[in-house]
Curated annotation (Swiss-Prot):
Record protein name field: Heat stress transcription factor C-1
Region (Hydrophobic repeat HR-A/B) location: 114-166
SMART domains in UniProt: HSF (SM00415)
Gene behind this protein: HSFC1
Domain notes: The hydrophobic-rich region (HR-A/B) corresponds to the oligomerization domain.
Amino acid sequence: MEDDNSNNNNNNNVIAPFIVKTYQMVNDPSTDWLITWGPAHNSFIVVDPLDFSQRILPAYFKHNNFSSFVRQLNTYGFRKVDPDRWEFANEHFLRGQKHLLNNIARRKHARGMYGQDLEDGEIVREIERLKEEQRELEAEIQRMNRRIEATEKRPEQMMAFLYKVVEDPDLLPRMMLEKERTKQQQQVSDKKKRRVTMSTVKSEEEEVEEDEGRVFRVMSSSTPSPSSTENLYRNHSPDGWIVPMTQGQFGSYETGLVAKSMLSNSTSSTSSSLTSTFSLPESVNGGGGGGCGSIQGERRYKETATFGGVVESNPPTTPPYPFSLFRGGF
């Protein structure tokens, strides 16, 4: 039992070589521009990871891999305390208190793997950010190179142009004439475009005027005719309607007027007609005497109305002259 306790005490007093080397790196004032203590002296900061990996790590370890160094810190319980910079801390890693370093022990495998995964994720994100910055810098360098090349080519182009002018003195006048000709052609093209536009507008205005003229003629031609007037009278007449029927150019005229009526004691419809007939002299129809001959033409006004439907009635036979003057009576 005593031997076991002494072994445990010896193990507790032994400081891990990694912790010793890390403390020496941080505590060395000559390397403060790469790695130094934090403001509260309970953490340390890696100022420039790239230079730190190339200059400091090979002097203390057998590698120059910053990711491996960070992974080792996580294994011994160090944590990153500032997301914007590489600052690490451990409760037993304090400035001027080396006796506390023996309390920093290596973590178990499970916890170490968990912390390692977290730190690996942070390292991957940092690497991606650095790669993005590198791509931006490379793109800027390419743009600067193109500008430099263009600037270098300008004197060469100017010298080549001057050489051509010396060899051919008429080069400048020809270039000026060509430029003037191109300008005139452009002006002519612009004028043609304006003319086409104006002609298009005029044609559209003429089409609109023609459409308005057609509408006016249609409205003029749709003026009510006598037949439409009679139809209007027929539709609005209180007694009935008059339907004109024309046969021949001149002749006798038969006017019939049928009035609508209803009987209060019957549901059947009745119709009554009042017929008046008058004849024109034969001379009007193209004859030569004062008497009245056969009827050459006839115009009839007929009106028939029934209650419950329309029944067309046959026109009455025209009585001979002179009875026609008395409308069928004396």
